Amino acid sequence: MAWGWWRRWRRWPARRWRRRRRRRPLRRRRAGRPARRYRRRRTVRTRRRRWGRRRYRRGWRRRTYVRKGRHRKKKKRLILRQWQPATRRRCTITGYLPIVFCGHTKGNKNYALHSDDYTPQGQPFGGALSTTSFSLKVLFDQHQRGLNKWSFPNDQLDLARYRGCKFIFYRTKQTDWIGQYDISEPYKLDKYSCPNYHPGNLIKAKHKFLIPSYDTNPRGRQKIIVKIPPPDLFVDKWYTQEDLCSVNLVSLAVSAASFLHPFGSPQTDNPCYTFQVLKEFYYQAIGFSATDESRNYVFNVLYEENSYWESNITPFYVINVKKGSNTXDYMSPXISDSHFRNKVNTNYNWYTYNAKSHKNDLHXLRRAYFKQLTTEGPQQTSSEKGYASQWTTPTTDAYEYHLGMFSTIFLAPDRPVPRFPCAYQDVTYNPLMDKGVGNHVWFQYNTKADTQLIVTGGSCKAHIEDIPLWAAFYGYSDFIESELGPFVDAETVGLICVICPYTKPPMYNKTNPMMGYVFYDRNFGDGKWIDGRGKIEPYWQVRWRPEMLFQETVMADIVQTGPFSYKDELKNSTLVAKYKFYFTWGGNMMFQQTIKNPCKTDGRPTDSDRHPRGIQVADPEQMGPRWVFHSFDWRRGYLSEGAIKRLHEKPLDYESYFTQPKRPRIFPPTEAAEGEFREPEKGSYSEEERSQASAEEQATEETVLLLKRRLREQRKLEQQLQFLTREMFKTQAGLHINPMLLSQR
């Protein structure tokens, strides 16, 4: 061959060096297992190219040679040692819980806040939204109710370690669900939390889980599994159960939704909603603190406008009204039919009633109604012929039921002649047109005279702005109830005001942009109670005025107009969840042996069946190192004197079984109510209790009582200093917990 000499003597160009591939050492096999025998690699038939393998012949390529690489000096391994208790036991807390229970007409309520309510049978229960927060204290409370089981007792090991949890949601037949979990602080509800949990906003969230119904997705898995790691700020180390008890482990927000009909129910032909709003002349005298001049102005408008009396109920409340104590006598003054009613035809735009000329008689008749309900009633006269219920008599008759400012004569929505002017206006809301910008929603007490929005000062509570109404009203009434606390009846102490320029007509006044509008439901306008019954108690007949109690239905209907909202067409919808929380108990266990006489029994008949092992679960708050026996407490077969003295100081917890919490434990705290209504620490005390008595009190108080008071203050101060010292020692030892995780404490 002509080029043979070149191939014999010419060396090929040197290959480009590359690092030699390091061989992994063979994994050490488990002892006792035979080595896996070699199997010939299975051949795979491949399609060959028609013209053979493509080769790059243009130019020449260097041939690569393998050169032994130079390895960097390996750094020394750092061995991190963590202290472990002598005894460690894994514990799985498994339980079932109705995360959401929504009765009919409760579509805008929060079930977590009402989960412990005693609702009478026949009335709806719960809500479509549930915001729950889980901690070791909540799990123990669920165990006391028989809703979970613990795989290993916690009464012998005082240390704990949290390793995460898992929730299993079971799909329902007709209702869809959407949820979101949170493991970041703060675990609190603010005024914008519930609007963000509306299905229309939650469907757009990045981190969420969907639970479709069988009607939406007939196929698929029967359950949705959600695995949740420990909190972000939680340091994985050993804590005492006493410290870990109040740590928030996870917060869940689950809401009922509708994936099949996101923008309207098939039972309706219109996505809009119409409700009634008071006219603007009411808003200067809406509260108790309004002046007599402003109230008289409202009565002058109502009693001088004949069109406002065009109602079917007018003759029953005005003409020839008889007394309640004696139906044979007429109230004074007696207004006859011939004087008050005109003989005209309303088809020709004539007013039926002549109220303007009987203005003074109407005022006197309203006062007569008020006397029949208060001073002349059985509750004041203590008559044996009637039921004497005791309640405080109002100071004004402006809110009388029959002829007061908010009588059904003026506010009934179904008018016999709709074209006549009335004391309210019909407002229509289209959720698709609500941009949110310029909307204002707030709650104010009945003591506020007008409906002017005051951002600073605290007179307007839970002020929400720039949010669509279908999201702002979601869980809003329950948030107000949690803000005001468990000792305030939020439904009867105030009302909700709204500013919304996206309704028709707009609930917005250009000349007075900060004036709020008050809406009410149909039952209040018809003079009925919230459940539709027409019998009104005398207590409410002298207090007939707009309250948040009479605004719940309107808020629920507006919430249903939002996208993906729950349509509330079923008797109830329930979402059941199974949870598993993984803990590890640790400590220095003292093994106790219970030895019985094998030759004698306790008198009960023997049973060949195997009984389940009883798990003793103790309150985690009572499982600190101070209240548990350890192996080092034994000295020569006996407990040491210090251990016995330490256990004698343990408080008894029998009373905690009968006392109910002020709010459900699974309900997370709110920002305003956290410091005011949370459960007090043991040994904590308020500023009023620590304050010293004034000089006048010391002069009148006896010396013995004063010394006892000083001694009580000193003991409380001692407990507080002991708590502060104990927390300081925990911080120095690295056993403290991030305070941001203790919002429920």
UniProtKB/Swiss-Prot annotation:
Renumbered to this chain, region (Disordered) spans 23-44, 598-619, 660-700
Regions of biased composition (Basic and acidic residues) lie at 599-612, 675-691
Keywords linked to the UniProt accession: Capsid protein, T=1 icosahedral capsid protein, Virion
Subcellular compartments: Virion
Q: Where is the signal peptide?
A: none
Against InterPro entries, the record matches this protein to: TTvirus_Unk
Does this UniProt record's set of keywords contain Signal?
no
* One GO cellular component term noted in the UniProt record for this chain: T=1 icosahedral viral capsid
**Function noted in UniProt:** Self assemble to form an icosahedral capsid.
Family to which this protein belongs: Belongs to the anelloviridae capsid protein family.
Protein's name according to its UniProt entry: Capsid protein
Tell me the lineage of the source organism. Viruses, Viruses incertae sedis, Anelloviridae, Torque teno virus
